[in-house]
Amino acid sequence: KEGYLFGSRG
């Protein structure tokens, strides 16, 4: 979900 900002938290 957070991947849109962090890419690695996905």
From Swiss-Prot:
Keyword annotations of the record: Phosphoprotein, Secreted, Toxin
Superkingdom of origin: Eukaryota
Positions bearing Phosphoserine: S8
Location in the cell: Secreted
Expression (tissue specificity): Expressed by the venom gland.
Principal subcellular localisation of the protein: secreted
Protein's name according to its UniProt entry: Toxin To46
Species in which this protein is naturally found: Tityus obscurus (Amazonian scorpion)
